[in-house]
Amino acid sequence: MDFYQPYYKLSTLVFKISFTLMSTDFEKLKEKIFKSSIEIVIFDGWSDKTLFEAASINEISFKDAKRMFPRGAIDLVKYYHEFEDKIFLAQFRKVDCIDLSHSKKIELALIKRFEIIVKNKEAFRRSMALFALPFYQIEGINLVFSTCDKIWVEIGDISVGFDWYTKRIILASIY
């Protein structure tokens, strides 16, 4: 993949360890920055400016914000997508869908996921615009594929091999 990927992973790990020693609220701080950034994204889009403005609202230094989101806006957008996946999974698990067929479960899961997207339409639209850029397309595809995989796993899919891939690709084309 990328030449700097091992360094990026190592520096993020070192920061998480050192930040955890300083504060046990690493994820809470990331969430605070993210939630503040949602309101800013509507006007400025997903950018480093948005990240730093959200950090300053929460009285977090730019240096620490950059350590939490090393690649700036793209890591913030990835966090946004993963955060909404967590919310989706929590809501979907509350629904009793044992008696439903796989297709009805998929339909219900997509409806739940789209309900979450609608709450922050503009942020979602701007994230899709960012992932349309050639150098971020692979990351966007990975996030969509990850969401589709989470949906199938949550439904209880146990397929392997070719079926595993085709189910996720078909769902990704719908999503």
PLM region descriptions:
Residues 26-53, 57-62, 71-78, 82:
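Short, amphipathic alpha-helix enriched in basic
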Residues 27, 92-126:
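Hydrophobic alpha-helical connector segments
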Residues 54, 58, 103-104, 144:
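Preference for well-ordered, secondary-structure-rich cores of eukaryotic proteins
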Residues 112-147:
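Internal, conserved structured core segments that host functional sites
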Residues 135-157, 168-175:
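Amphipathic alpha-helical packing segments from all-alpha helical-bundle domains
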